[in-house]
Amino acid sequence: MAKGEIVTVKIEEMDFKGYGVGYCEGKPLKVRGGILGQRVAVRVKKGKKGRAEGEIVEVIERSPFEVESPCPHFGECGGCTYQNLSYENQLKIKKDVVLKLLEKEGIKDFEFLGIERSPKVYGYRNKMEYTFGTDREGKKALGLHRKGKFYDVVMTDKCNIVDEDFTKALSLTFNYALEKNLPFYDKKTHEGYLRYLVVRKASKNGELLINIVTTTQLKHKFDDLVELYRSANFSSTLVGVLHTYNDSWSDAVICEKLEVLYGRDYLIEELLGLKFKISAFSFFQTNSYGAERIYSTVREFAGDVSNKTIFDLYCGTGTIGIVMAPLARKVIGIELVEEAVFSAKENAALNGLENAVFIAGDVSKKLREIKEKPDIVVVDPPRSGVNPKALEDIVNFEPEKIIYVSCNPESFARDLRLFVDKGYAVKKVKAIDMFPHTYHVELVGLLEKS
C-alpha cells in the first residue's frame, strides 16, 4: 500500500479507538469512520510507526449493522462515533474489543462479567464544553468541533447525548451573543471575546451551573444574560452563573480569574447516597448514573472490607475512596494534582468521613513513604496506565486484592499482564458502558494474589 493509493477493503473488526480495520495485501488498514461490515474505498495515509491508516472516499456497501442516526449532527460533529449503530451492536463491538486485547496479552482463566449498559443511553452527559467559533462556511457557531478539524465548530443545538437544559443554555447564550454583537474568539488570530460555554448538571441532585469563558479583550457585563438564565424554564435548579477569564492561547478552559455572577461556584451531586461538591473545574465522571455502576462494581469486587485498609491510587477528587470509606476500616488516597486532593478532603468532610486520608504527590514516590500496608489496592490511573515504578511498589505491598479501574482497554490489558507476571491472577473483569454512541468503555478488573 502506497501513500495516496485508493484501495477497497471490507471492515472486518473495530479497534479500541473506534477505527474500522480492514486488510489489504494481508496488512491491517485502520479506517477512520469505518463500521464493521462496510465495504469501502479508502485513500491510504501512513500512520504512526509505519502502520497504515486511511480515510473513506466512498462507501461501496453499507454495513448490515448500520442504522439511521437519530442525531442530525452525526457525521459532521466530532462528539460521537457510533450514532449509526444500534445500541446492542455498540455494546457488542466494545465487548469484543476488550476480549481481543485481553486475549492478545494472554489473560485467561478469568470470569468475564460482560458489558453493562449505561442506565441512560441518551441525555446522559452531566458536563459539556461548548466552543464559540465559526462553522466551515464562516458563520458564527456555538457547539462542538467538526470531526477531525481544529478550527471549525458545529452548532450542536439538537445534540441527543446531553440534557435538554444544556441545549436551552446553548441557544439562550448564542442568541444573546448575536444580539449584543459580541465577538467570537478566533483561534488563528487569537482575537475575540467569547471562548467557551461550560454547562454542568448534578444529574441525581438536579442542580445546574453555567460558566461563560471569555478573554479580557473586552469589558462586558452579563447581568441581562444572567436574568435570561434565571427566567428560563430549566428543568434543573440554576445554582450558579460564573464568568471565567482565559487569555491562554491553548485550546482549553483555563481559569486565570473567576467571578461569580449569580449564586455559587459549585454544585452538589449524589452518588450511592454520598454527597460530592463539584466546582466549575473539578474532574468528575461525566455520566453520573454510569459512575454509580463503576463504584458499585468496585464495592462488589472488594467484598467485606470492614476490617481492611484500602489504598486508592490516582484517586483524583477521591470519589472511589469516599465511596469505599463508609464500609472500610481506613482509606488512603494518593493523587498528583493538589487541587484534586483538596476537593477529596472537602468531600470526605462533607460526608463526615474521618477514616479517609488523601495525600498530594506522585504515586510512585508517595508509596515508598507510607508505612501502612494495604489489604486492598484500588488503581484508577490515567489513560497511559500505571507507572512501572508504582506497579512494582504495589506488588511489593502484597495486597490480597488489586482492583483496577480503567478508561483505556489497551493499557488495562497490558498492566493486567504485568501484574500476572508478578504473581497475581485475574479473577474477574467487567466492562461498563459510560459513554453510549462513542468508542469509549470503562473497565473494572479484580486481581488476587496467586
From Swiss-Prot:
Check the record and name the CDD domains matching this protein: AdoMet_MTases
Q: Recorded GO terms, molecular function?
A: 4 iron, 4 sulfur cluster binding; metal ion binding; rRNA (uridine-C5-)-methyltransferase activity
Q: Which organism is it from?
A: Caldanaerobacter subterraneus subsp. tengcongensis (strain DSM 15242 / JCM 11007 / NBRC 100824 / MB4)
InterPro entries in the cross-refs: MeTrfase_TrmA_AS, MeTrfase_TrmA_CS, NA-bd_OB-fold, SAM-dependent_MTases_sf, TRAM_dom, U5_MeTrfase_fam
The EC number(s) this enzyme carries? 2.1.1.-
Listed disulfide bonds for this chain?
A: none
Every TRAM domain range = 1-58
For this UniProt record, give its keywords in alphabetical order, as a comma-separated list.
4Fe-4S, Iron, Iron-sulfur, Metal-binding, Methyltransferase, S-adenosyl-L-methionine, Transferase
Official protein name in the record: Uncharacterized RNA methyltransferase TTE1797
Mention any Pfam family matching this sequence. tRNA_U5-meth_tr
Q: Which residues bind [4Fe-4S] cluster?
A: C71, C77, C80, C159
Task: Name the family the entry cites.
Answer: Belongs to the class I-like SAM-binding methyltransferase superfamily. RNA M5U methyltransferase family.
The active site consists of: C407 (nucleophile)
Q: Which NCBIfam families match?
A: rumA
Residues annotated as binding S-adenosyl-L-methionine? Q285, Y314, E335, D380
One GO biological-process annotation of the entry reads: rRNA base methylation
